[in-house]
């Protein structure tokens, strides 16, 4: 290379150094000073990874003094360049600027500038960049964006609710599905979709203390949402660094008690500007018109300040009308301000729901029903449908379906409440109880007597709880080393049971972590039974390992021993055998235990085994659960209400299991009350609301569509290519698993979500569900999204040169591949990506400016190309630079027409969709006051802003590749 002192060069490998100046040279070496960074670099003359910087007429350059020059001509003298042109600051013409006086901060980021400066990327990076642009555009256009990346089964009713609510502005809804139908997953899906689409950025979740860990695990494992758990310690520490600790995190999880106990915390929470508030177990917020509870007031204050609110609650039939009204009042106090008016309205809608039953059952409608429907659907042009509804032909069916859909839209609370029932969803397995009575050991009888003598001052409920766990009482008196497992018949029963079911996975749940640990030791030492232990003392990583050990079909544990708290938030549908080593003290916990297996997706009947001690509190509680509530073999929506009603009596029987006078009558009374309440709930079912909540056939189609997206071969190929280029090592494991680890040649020193220890991934949803430690990779996973951002936010791959071996074309023939991006810069919450995501337009030009891209598909063409060494590529570019400039000019003219057509199409689509939604809501507002005024205003303003930003959309060159034909 010919070097001259004062020449300007740029580093091919360290672009961030800026413009370098030749300050020394000899026969073998050359020294460059990069004054921006104050660093020198010494290179070998013959093979230096640097490129001569030479600008062209028409370019604009900046002097070291800051003024800019539009170049007209260039002079070269003794190897040094002088640029002559017009100063842009004062208009002076004929100005000169020697290259040594160019601004050293200059870097090349535009694709054409990097190409001409010799900063040419590898061919595979150009291909990855184009694929990233293409896939990014396609994924954001998909209507299901935000729904498919969850690590959960694709359940139609859950997808319907998430899709319906997740696309709203500041949704305020009540999620009231029956237990086991996935309210937590629905809330997580809504949060995930709102965040992915830019509608929300800051989320606050408030739950009972006992559910904190469950929510933390669910949000992380299923949705890749990293919530920060705030407790007293975390809050106090954060106060040292911030005036408002809650502003230090975007996603916060805390308990209701944590908020309730401190007025300052509540003030800080209300000032932190959240987008969404999520409240679990909202039915425990006690309210009356004259005396609302402190808990209710806390949530009411938060709900007043936070635009989006999701309340997770028991079904309205369980709560009673007034309690249900209290929940709705939190969502929309203007709409639900008068309880009596609400009760009257609900009675009116009850008549509508009954009429819907006639529609769904294909029964004829009498005059009263027709009048009611006409009144309810006034203003919606339903007269023609009503006239056809009693006709006995196919049109009749169509009219009934359309009328039902219109009623769902106009239903009183259908926009603010979703409630699915097991009866409506179907697909659940049967539950079978296998109770095994075992003799009460003498050691426990003695311990009970001693406890009775010594615990005379205990509260009744404390005494009752102690009596449920005799091994705990025995250890209190004999010490922690007491070997209760040597005489407790439940232990030997468990050993024999597991030996009989060697080929089955068995979940064992007990109340205390200590019991689980002791049982694992016994199983291991007595019979060598492989068991994993799961309790609250384990870290999240250790729990994952235990769950994975249990899930492994080949060499995994036969049994998983869980404590009560440790099992929260984990589901094991692949197992169907459950052993309750003891019983929990309330029906909610019992259902929570069974719910570890009894989930949608369970394909076998659940066998519930309860070894219990005769003449003990366990025997009493077993009878009450089974005979009084039917809580083992069916879900028990009445359980909590009856538990609260009968609390004192039940605790008395549990505290003194030997005094059973009247127990049978008590249990019979409970069963009668249970049956009556259940019948009352069934009678109160709102079929219209259920129909609206489960989504019907469209929800099933959505689930099927998403299922077809799983195992997308394009995603797999793109991800593996991405990992290779970023420098993430991949180790194949069995069962479609990959282990990702950072390598020594990473593009970035620290890639998010890939730790030093590595992470296990799969592209298979079922595999991810079966193995807790495995991450489910989709287009929405942070690893893929961060990889896309890494590629597209840098210059990587935006400049390339390739050789095309084709003897049908003359040697030296030039082709220019141009990737333009059409985009609109707008706030994320407008979701312009629905209409115009950053969309690539590809041109493939010959020397005459003819676009060959429609005839030459990218992937097929790319496979015919060969790489070329960088120095050779740099020389080739320099030799043909004038021709490339001309081809670029042709490209600018060609792309303008295509880009504007794309923008016009996006604007028309946005106008059509958003105008239709606004018109629909305005029409419904007349018959459904649940549609809020601010929601209408938000939709109208959203439409205006979207159309304005689409009008301002533009395009730019994102990547360039020069192709040179060769015959070698």
Curated annotation (Swiss-Prot):
Pfam families per record: Helicase_C, RapA_C, SNF2-rel_dom, Tudor_1_RapA, Tudor_RapA
Helicase C-terminal domain mapped to chain residues: 493-644
Motif (DEAH box): 280-283
Keyword DNA repair recorded: no
Entry annotated with the keyword DNA-binding: yes
Amino-acid positions noted as binding ATP in the UniProt annotation, renumbered to this chain: 177-184
Enzyme class: hydrolase
Domain Helicase ATP-binding: 164-334
Highest taxon above the source species: Bacteria
InterPro entries (UniProt xref): Helicase_ATP-bd (IPR014001), Helicase_C-like (IPR001650), Helicase_RapA (IPR023949), P-loop_NTPase (IPR027417), RapA_C (IPR022737), SNF2-like_sf (IPR038718), SNF2/RAD54-like_C (IPR049730), SNF2_N (IPR000330)
Annotated EC: 3.6.4.-
GO molecular function: ATP binding; DNA binding; helicase activity; hydrolase activity, acting on acid anhydrides
PANTHER family given in the database record: DNA ANNEALING HELICASE AND ENDONUCLEASE ZRANB3 FAMILY MEMBER, SWI_SNF-RELATED MATRIX-ASSOCIATED ACTIN-DEPENDENT REGULATOR OF CHROMATIN SUBFAMILY A-LIKE PROTEIN 1
Quaternary structure, from the entry: Interacts with the RNAP. Has a higher affinity for the core RNAP than for the holoenzyme. Its ATPase activity is stimulated by binding to RNAP.
Described purpose of this protein according to its UniProt entry: Transcription regulator that activates transcription by stimulating RNA polymerase (RNAP) recycling in case of stress conditions such as supercoiled DNA or high salt concentrations. Probably acts by releasing the RNAP, when it is trapped or immobilized on tightly supercoiled DNA. Does not activate transcription on linear DNA. Probably not involved in DNA repair.
Homology family: Belongs to the SNF2/RAD54 helicase family. RapA subfamily.
Listed name of the protein: RNA polymerase-associated protein RapA
Organism: Sodalis glossinidius (strain morsitans)
């Amino acid at each position: 290379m010919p070097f001259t002192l004062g020449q300007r060069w740029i580093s091919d490998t360290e672009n961030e150094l800026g413009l370098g100046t030749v300050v020394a040279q000899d026969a073998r070496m050359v020294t460059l000073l990069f004054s921006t960074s104050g660093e020198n670099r010494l290179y070998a003359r013959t093979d230096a990874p640097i490129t001569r910087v030479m600008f062209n007429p028409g370019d604009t350059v900046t002097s070291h003094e800051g003024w800019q020059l539009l170049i007209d001509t260039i002079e070269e003298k003794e190897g040094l360049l002088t640029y002559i042109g017009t100063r842009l600051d004062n208009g002076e013409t004929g100005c000169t600027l020697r290259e040594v006086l160019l601004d050293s901060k200059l870097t090349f980021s535009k694709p054409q500038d990097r190409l001409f400066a010799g900063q040419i990327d590898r061919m595979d990076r150009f291909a990855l960049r184009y694929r990233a642009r293409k896939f990014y555009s396609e994924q954001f256009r998909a209507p299901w964006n935000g729904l498919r990346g969850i690590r959960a089964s694709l359940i139609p009713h859950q997808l319907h609710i998430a899709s319906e609510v997740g696309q709203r502005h500041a949704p305020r809804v009540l999620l009231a599905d029956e237990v086991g139908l996935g309210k937590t997953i629905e809330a997580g899906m809504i949060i995930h979709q709102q965040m992915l689409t830019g509608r929300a950025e800051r989320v606050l979740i408030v739950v009972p203390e006992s559910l904190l860990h469950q929510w933390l695990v669910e949000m992380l494992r299923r949705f890749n949402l990293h919530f920060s758990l705030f407790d007293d310690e975390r809050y106090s520490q954060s106060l040292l660094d911030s005036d408002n600790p809650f502003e230090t995190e975007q996603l916060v999880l805390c308990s209701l008690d944590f908020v309730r106990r401190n007025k300052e915390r509540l003030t800080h929470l209300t000032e932190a500007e959240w987008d969404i508030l999520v409240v679990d177990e909202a039915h425990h917020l006690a309210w009356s018109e004259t005396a609302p509870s402190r808990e209710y007031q806390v949530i009411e204050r938060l709900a007043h300040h936070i635009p989006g609110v999701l309340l997770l609650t028991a079904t309205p039939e369980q709560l009673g009308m007034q309690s249900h009204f209290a929940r709705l009042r939190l969502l929309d106090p203007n709409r639900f301000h008068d309880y009596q008016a609400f009760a009257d309205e609900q009675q009116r809608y009850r008549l509508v729901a009954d009429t819907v039953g006639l529609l769904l059952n294909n029964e004829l409608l009498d005059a009263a029903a027709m009048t009611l429907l006409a009144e309810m659907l006034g203003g919606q042009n339903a007269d023609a449908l009503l006239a056809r509804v009693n006709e006995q032909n196919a049109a009749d069916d169509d009219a009934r379906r359309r009328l039902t859909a219109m009623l769902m839209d106009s239903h009183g609370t259908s926009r603010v409440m979703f409630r699915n029932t097991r009866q409506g969803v179907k697909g659940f397995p049967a539950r079978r109880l296998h109770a095994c009575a075992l003799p009460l050991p003498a050691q426990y009888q003695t311990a009970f007597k001693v406890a009775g003598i010594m615990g005379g001052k205990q509260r009744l409920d404390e005494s009752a709880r102690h009596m449920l766990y005799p091994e705990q009482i025995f250890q209190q008196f004999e010490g922690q080393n007491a070997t209760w497992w040597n005489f407790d018949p439940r232990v030997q029963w468990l050993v024999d049971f597991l030996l009989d079911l060697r080929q089955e996975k068995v979940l064992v749940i007990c109340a205390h972590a200590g019991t689980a640990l002791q049982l694992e030791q016994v199983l291991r030492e007595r019979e060598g039974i492989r068991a994993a232990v799961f309790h609250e003392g384990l870290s999240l990583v250790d729990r994952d390992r235990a769950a994975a050990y249990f899930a492994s079909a080949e060499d995994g544990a036969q049994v998983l021993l869980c404590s009560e708290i440790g099992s929260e938030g984990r589901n094991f549908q692949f197992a169907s055998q459950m052993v309750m080593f003891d019983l929990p003290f309330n029906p909610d916990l019992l259902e929570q235990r069974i719910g570890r297996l009894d989930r949608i997706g369970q394909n076998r009947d659940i066998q519930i085994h309860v070894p219990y001690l005769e003449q003990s509190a366990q025997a009493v509680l077993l009878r009450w659960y089974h005979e009084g509530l039917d809580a083992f073999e069916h879900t028990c929506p009445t359980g909590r209400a009856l538990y609260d009603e009968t609390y004192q009596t039940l605790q008395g029987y549990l505290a003194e299991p030997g005094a059973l006078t009247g127990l049978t009558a008590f249990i019979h009374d409970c069963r009668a009350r249970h049956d009556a309440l259940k019948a009352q709930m069934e009678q109160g079912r709102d079929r219209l609301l259920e129909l609206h909540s489960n989504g019907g056939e469209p929800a099933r189609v959505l689930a099927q569509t998403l299922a077809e997206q799983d195992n997308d071969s394009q995603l797999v190929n793109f991800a593996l290519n991405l990992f290779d280029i970023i420098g993430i090592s991949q180790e194949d494991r069995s069962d479609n698993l990959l282990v990702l680890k950072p390598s020594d040649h990473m593009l970035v020193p620290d890639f998010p979500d890939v730790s030093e220890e590595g992470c296990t991934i799969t592209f298979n949803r079922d595999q991810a569900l079966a193995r807790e430690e495995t991450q489910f990779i989709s287009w929405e996973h942070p690893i893929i999204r961060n990889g896309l951002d890494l590629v597209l936010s840098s210059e990587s791959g935006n400049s390339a040169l390739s050789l095309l071996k084709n003897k049908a074309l003359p040697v030296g023939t030039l082709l220019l591949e141009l990737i333009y991006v059409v985009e609109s810069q707008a706030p994320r919450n407008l979701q312009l990506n629905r209409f115009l995501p950053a969309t690539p337009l590809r041109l493939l030009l010959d020397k005459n400016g003819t676009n060959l891209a429609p005839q030459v598909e990218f992937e097929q063409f790319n496979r015919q190309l060969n790489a070329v060494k960088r120095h050779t590529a740099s020389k080739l570019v320099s030799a043909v630079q004038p021709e490339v400039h001309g081809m670029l000019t042709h490209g600018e003219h060609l792309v303008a027409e295509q880009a504007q057509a794309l923008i016009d199409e996006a604007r028309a689509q946005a106008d059509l969709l958003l105008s239709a939604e606004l018109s629909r809501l305005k029409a419904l507002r007349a018959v459904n006051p649940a549609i809020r005024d601010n929601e209408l205003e938000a939709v109208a303003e959203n439409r205006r802003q979207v159309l304005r930003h689409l009008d301002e959309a533009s395009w730019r060159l994102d990547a360039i590749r020069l192709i040179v034909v060769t015959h070698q």
